[in-house]
């Protein structure tokens, strides 16, 4: 499973030649569309729930007993640098990331979300399930299970955690900058409706070129920050941690063509001159 999960990258290769991506700003009108908030939360939460199930059940089947609660929290790594401390960090990072990404972001933080086509939902659901099984199996018993197996690279854990934290916070910052564009549109439309005495049935989606933080140089800075986040997570687990490495490679091969596709969308909607030299994802490079 660890090795074959990389085949997901081959499936997403179609994005290099097709601009058809019925989600987000490139969503399409379809009778089969799924509500954006519900679609995002369900396809992301499936992997998260599966990961938790594996972490609870697999250790018993392998005769390892119950994993301590510290394995489920990032704080565990600050308490002890022994035994399952790396699993503590890795599991805590995954839990926190997906609580933000699968629950808080779509259901509570995003003012609105474009509909998702079932085709995208199915592919994303499959990706999450493969990812959860790959990572969950590794962390719950098929990877290193003793402090001796982790001791040789314990010095990289802190650096990896710092990189992961920076990537997550930067990703959240840039995500919120995109949300503020929608919130500003929401406030403006509601104010106009209140002045006219008319009810607000729905808020029209407004698209602008984001300009804060790394958005000054990259149109998809939030993608780049997520790559950095998971590169740090891979470092925490060690360079030989195949599920972490494979996950990062899948993220890059999936999100890079999407970013290039998004740049073409921005150029078509606003014109190349309005982008002021911004790259698709890596400032000054690509």
PLM regions: where:
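Hydrophobic transmembrane alpha-helices
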Residues: 1-4, 51-54, 125-127, 142-286
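Juxtamembrane membrane-interface segments at transmembrane-helix boundaries in membrane proteins
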Residues: 20-39, 67-85, 147-157, 205-212, ...
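Intramembrane catalytic core of multi-pass membrane enzymes that act on lipidic substrates
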Residues: 32, 56-141
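Hydrophobic alpha-helical transmembrane segments of polytopic
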Residues: 36, 40-47, 90-97, 120, ...
């Amino acid at each position: 499973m660890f090795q074959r999960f990389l085949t997901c990258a081959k499936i997403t290769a179609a994005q290099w030649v097709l601009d058809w991506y019925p989600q987000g700003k490139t969503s399409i009108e379809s009778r089969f569309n799924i509500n954006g908030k519900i679609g995002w939360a369900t396809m992301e939460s499936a992997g998260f729930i599966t990961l938790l199930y594996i972490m609870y059940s697999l250790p018993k089947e392998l005769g390892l007993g119950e994993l301590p609660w510290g394995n489920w929290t990032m704080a565990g790594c600050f308490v002890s640098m022994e035994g399952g401390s790396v699993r503590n960090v890795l599991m805590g990072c995954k839990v926190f990331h997906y609580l933000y990404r699968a629950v808080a972001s779509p259901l509570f933080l995003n003012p609105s979300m474009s509909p998702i086509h079932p085709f995208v939902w199915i592919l994303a659901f499959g990706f999450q399930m493969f990812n959860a099984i790959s990572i969950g199996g590794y962390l719950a018993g098929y990877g290193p299970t003793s402090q001796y197996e982790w001791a040789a690279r314990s010095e990289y854990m802190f650096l990896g955690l710092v990189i992961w934290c920076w990537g997550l916070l930067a990703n959240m910052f840039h995500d919120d900058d995109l949300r503020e564009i929608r919130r500003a549109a929401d406030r403006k439309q509601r104010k106009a409706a209140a002045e006219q005495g008319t009810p607000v049935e729905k808020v029209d989606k407004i698209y602008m070129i984001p300009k804060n933080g790394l958005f000054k140089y990259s149109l998809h800075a939030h993608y780049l920050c997520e790559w950095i986040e998971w590169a740090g997570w891979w470092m925490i687990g060690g360079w030989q941690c195949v599920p972490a490495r494979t996950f990062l490679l899948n993220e890059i091969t999936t999100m890079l063509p999407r970013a290039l596709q998004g740049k073409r969308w921005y150029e078509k909607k606003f014109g190349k001159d309005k982008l002021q030299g911004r790259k698709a994802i890596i400032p000054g490079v690509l």
